[in-house]
Regions:
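Regulatory hinge/linker segments at domain boundaries
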Residues: 2-23, 81, 85-88
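Basic, Lys/Arg-enriched C-terminal extension of HTH/homeodomain DNA-binding domains
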Residues: 10, 58-91
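Conserved catalytic core of two-component sensor histidine kinases
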Residues: 19, 26, 50
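Pre-recognition alpha-helix immediately N-terminal to the DNA-recognition helix
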Residues: 23-24, 67
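A cross-family signal for key residues in well-ordered alpha-helices
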Residues: 27, 40, 70
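Short helix-to-turn junction characteristic of helix-turn-helix DNA-binding domains
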Residues: 29-33, 72
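Recognition helix of helix-turn-helix DNA-binding domains
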Residues: 32-67
Length: 91
């Protein structure tokens, strides 16, 4: 068994460890939105977005946004839904 295969089976499922709001923030980050865009979309402050992202990193055991997004995508994230609807983001 390769090391990569072992690491993949040990990945935490974000849906199991994150709150619904943390998952929503992570999904929007995965779409490439900035903290300001996420804050605007969710009607919260940029500070609140940063707070949620810090909790995401801690709960998933990652150290940055890219690692969190990769983990979310590897565990079946972004299947659709309100958080992934970008129609209101088109200029």
């Amino acid at each position: 068994m390769s090391h990569g295969a072992v690491a993949e089976t040990e990945l935490p499922d974000p849906r199991a460890v994150l709150s619904p709001r943390e998952l929503e923030v992570l999904d929007l980050a995965a779409l490439g939105l900035t903290n300001l865009q996420i804050a605007t979309r969710l009607h919260v402050t940029v500070h609140a977005v940063k707070f949620h992202l810090a909790a995401v990193y801690r709960k998933l055991g990652v150290s940055n946004r890219t690692e969190a997004v990769v983990l979310r995508l590897r565990t079946g994230g972004l299947a659709g839904g309100a958080a992934t609807d970008t129609t209101d983001l088109v200029a």
